[in-house]
């Protein structure tokens, strides 16, 4: 990243997400999004907002997904030596009994010098998968990453 500018990059796009299942387990949604990458010292701050593209009410397989996944998220990325830490948080911004959100923490670390990384992920909240977006999930993941 260039130290001269606070805004390092931005993205605009169309995001399609689907679980690839057939009805009745089918879940999908389409969003237009905007994301900025800002650098504050060694910390990268990446807010993203989205607009869900409307679907036909008769065929919408998750009509209340916005109530669980909200309208945006915030990602914090902190590279530290050969390690990378990421925190992703989202909330539906309903500060009442319908309040829903999620937080995800990722840690990648080198295993060897050939580009293979260890990966640990902690997740708590709603929207971890499309089929169960409306169910709260608490999960720990351990694995390998080929890139980061």
Protein language model features and the residues they cover:
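Outer-membrane pore/translocation modules
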Residues: 1-81, 89-91, 96-98, 118, ...
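Beta-strand elements of well-folded, non-transmembrane domains
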Residues: 18-20, 111, 148
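Short, electropositive alpha-helical surface patch
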Residues: 100-111
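Generic recognition of flexible, low-complexity loop/linker segments
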Residues: 107, 129-130
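Short glycine/proline-rich, acidic loop/turn segments that cap or connect secondary-structure elements
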Residues: 113-116
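Flexible, glycine-rich linker and terminal segments associated
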Residues: 121, 129, 146-148
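Outer-membrane beta-barrel "beta-signal"
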Residues: 137-148
């Amino acid at each position: 990243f260039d130290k001269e500018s606070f805004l390092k990059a931005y993205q605009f796009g169309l995001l399609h997400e689907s679980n690839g299942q057939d009805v009745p387990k089918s879940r999908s949604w389409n969003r237009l999004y905007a994301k900025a990458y800002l650098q504050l010292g060694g910390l990268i701050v990446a807010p993203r907002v989205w607009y869900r593209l409307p679907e036909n009410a008769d065929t919408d397989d998750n009509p209340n997904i916005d109530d669980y996944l909200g309208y945006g998220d915030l990602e914090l990325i902190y590279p530290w030596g050969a390690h990378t830490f990421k925190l992703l948080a989202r909330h539906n911004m309903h500060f009442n009994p319908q309040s829903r959100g999620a937080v995800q923490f990722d840690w990648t670390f080198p295993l060897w010098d050939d580009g293979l990384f260890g990966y640990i992920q902690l997740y708590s909240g709603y929207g971890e998968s499309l089929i169960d977006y409306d169910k709260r999930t608490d999960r720990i993941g351990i694995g390998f990453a080929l890139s980061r």
